[in-house]
Amino acid sequence: MVEDLAASYIVLKLENEIRQAQVQWLMEENAALQAQIPELQKSQAAKEYDLLRKSSEAKEPQKLPEHMNPPAAWEAQKTPEFKEPQKPPEPQDLLPWEPPAAWELQEAPAAPESLAPPATRESQKPPMAHEIPTVLEGQGPANTQDATIAQEPKNSEPQDPPNIEKPQEAPEYQETAAQLEFLELPPPQEPLEPSNAQEFLELSAAQESLEGLIVVETSAASEFPQAPIGLEATDFPLQYTLTFSGDSQKLPEFLVQLYSYMRVRGHLYPTEAALVSFVGNCFSGRAGWWFQLLLDIQSPLLEQCESFIPVLQDTFDNPENMKDANQCIHQLCQGEGHVATHFHLIAQELNWDESTLWIQFQEGLASSIQDELSHTSPATNLSDLITQCISLEEKPDPNPLGKSSSAEGDGPESPPAENQPMQAAINCPHISEAEWVRWHKGRLCLYCGYPGHFARDCPVKPHQALQAGNIQACQ
């Protein structure tokens, strides 16, 4: 059940990380595009300014003839003043037209001098003056009415310039308005040349790909143990604190977090011993004390994480109440085996202070161990006292064969209570038969529960006698 919850938790967490990476990538892409907008606006504004300048330069030579048309119109208006005495239809009067035409040629340059026009106007007016005689010469044999008809379109020329200038002025206002609109409201779709657009897309795509790779490397390499090669980088910080103080109510939550961490970052710990050491560093309080005891006795559980986790779960997630633990710790006594582990397992369920546990631990020690402790330097805390006891218990026995032969002789019978180091643990419900199975998996002695030998080589009692003692204790 816990593994299923851990698996579902990991799946949800991975999906969340992927969504967060996608959102971050989109935000960076949006930021990159927004950073490119001012440059595009500047380039577009420069292009618009160049187009407006070119269009204004192209329109300037067209405006010059407009200003030059009024003098030409004035000349066309002056001709009828000289032609008024020519109204009689006498054919002889047609000959004197030549002097007025020549006189007009002289007056044409005089009029621009009084008005002081630029040189461009002077260069353009002589053709106007020459055109008038040519028209008049072609109309010489014709009637004066034809001349007046030919002059009427010329008289209408002064009316054309204002009409022509009005539509030319309107685009100027429209262009200025267009400039203001361009500056105030930048268009979302700016026209770009195909080559510029391709370069911009290539540059933006390259930048976004590099930034995306950096983000993915920092997150995926730390969160996914089987990430592709090249994406492994610095570890991503945990979103929760992986700690356990020994509270049985918080153990399931700690195990879920631990399983998810092992699935995600298990590759960071090449050996099971390194992983167990990491888990032990997360302990505090009673759990830290229990782990320190395993370090002191060099338990094989420290080398196998698969055996360490079940023992941890059975130790701190046992429904044993404080009353039973209180009874068991008073019944605990030492025979010829270790008592430190059993004392520590029972003390987990009690809220006693260190001084009380110190006194109770000394009461459960064998007299030989107490005598040896009196000749050594006193310990400063309970952990040092337990370490001294373990070192004294592990001293070689001068007559192990005699003990083993006596143990074998007493095999069919139930051993006395003082020769059973696990008698109190067997009587205590905290030590169950499932724990013996875990000791077997942890390569511990199935009789005393400590490393260095197996049950068949145990100097106290063989494995068969231990099973018989368990059956009698249960009965």
From Swiss-Prot:
Disulfide bonds: none
Segments forming CCHC-type zinc fingers: 443-462
GO cellular component, one term: nucleus
Localization: Nucleus
Example of a GO MF term: zinc ion binding
Alphabetical keyword list: Metal-binding, Nucleus, Zinc, Zinc-finger
Biased composition (Basic and acidic residues): 51-66, 78-87
Segments for region (Disordered): 51-101, 152-173, 397-421
A Pfam family hit: zf-CCHC
Coiled coil regions in record: none
Record carries keyword Zinc-finger: yes
InterPro entries: DUF4939, RTL1-rel, Znf_CCHC, Znf_CCHC_sf
Main subcellular localisation: nucleus
Superkingdom as given in the UniProt entry: Eukaryota
Cited function: May function as a transcriptional regulator. Plays a role in postnatal myogenesis, may be involved in the regulation of satellite cells self-renewal.
PANTHER family linked: LDOC1 RELATED (PTHR15503), RETROTRANSPOSON GAG-LIKE PROTEIN 3 (PTHR15503:SF7)
Extra information: RTL3 is one of at least 11 genes called Mar or Mart related to long terminal repeat retrotransposons. They do not correspond to functional retrotransposons, but rather to neofunctionalized retrotransposons genes.
Name under which the protein is recorded: Retrotransposon Gag-like protein 3
Originating organism: Homo sapiens (Human)
Highest classification ranks of the organism: Eukaryota, Metazoa, Chordata, Craniata, Vertebrata
